[in-house]
Amino acid sequence: MIPWNAYVRLLRLNKPIGILLLWYPTAWALWMANQGFPSIDLLMIFLLGTVFMRSAGCVINDIADRHIDRHVARTQFRPLTSGEVSLSEAFILLFILLCASLLLLLKLPINCFYFAVISVLITFVYPFCKRFLNAPQLILGLAFSMGIPMAFIASGKNLNSDFVVLFLINFTWIIAYDTMYAMTDKADDLKIGVKSTAIYFASYDRLIIALLLIFLHSLWLVWAINKNAEWFFYLLWCTAAGILTYQLKLIYARIPKNCFKAFLVSGYYGLVMWFAVGLALI
């Protein structure tokens, strides 16, 4: 009998927050590069690509961490660790996902291929970075930002000032929200020697997260002023600022379940800013 439920959990399809956090920056880029009106074809290619590559990343991560996950309370029952899915099954799923992603990539300009290769290489390397880099979130930031240049290139645009601002916003955002995520497992990670910015930042974790959020949210103002955005952009910008404030409140006591909740709330920030970008470009 095929363990469909275990496959769904291995690919994290039951927890779509990872897909959303990869999709929103790509959507921001598609809207920016197409003046608010990306084609249906591009949307479908990038949306499916997001799902396939995020799922592939989860499989790669679980293959690399299958011996570590059993020592972390939050991950000890993942399908590979628990034996519900075999290692060979995981590799077959990974192969299928990468092939599906390649088929989508063939529909995009050749220059997208170079960024896709970088993305795949980083995705394979990232799980191992947690073992020797104090700030593996920097690597994750690169991996989760590759959809941005690909969206601009696929839309026939140069990597212009909009791209630079958006790349900085997303890279900073990833470090901030993944540090919140890492705060959830900090106690277990310290025991088994897994590294993260939550550990590296030590007692300055909340302050650094706050500074990162202020920086990235301010960059949106730079973009909006340059685009002569109307008042509704700023209304949504203020709403998003409220979401960031709520996240900082959640992580204040460093309670693991609240830190994880703060991470999940990042999805609302991405959604609100997607609406803000879309309205600003109408």
Swiss-Prot record:
Single Gene Ontology MF annotation: 4-hydroxybenzoate polyprenyltransferase activity
Pathway annotation from the record: Cofactor biosynthesis; ubiquinone biosynthesis
Gene: ubiA
InterPro entries with a match to the protein in the record: HB_polyprenyltransferase-like, Prenyltransferase, UbiA_prenyltransferase, UbiA_prenylTrfase_CS, UbiA_sf
Protein's recorded name: 4-hydroxybenzoate octaprenyltransferase
Necessary cofactors: Mg(2+)
NCBIfam families: ubiA_proteo
CDD domains listed in its UniProt record: PT_UbiA_COQ2
Listed PROSITE patterns: UBIA (PS00943)
Subcellular location: Cell inner membrane
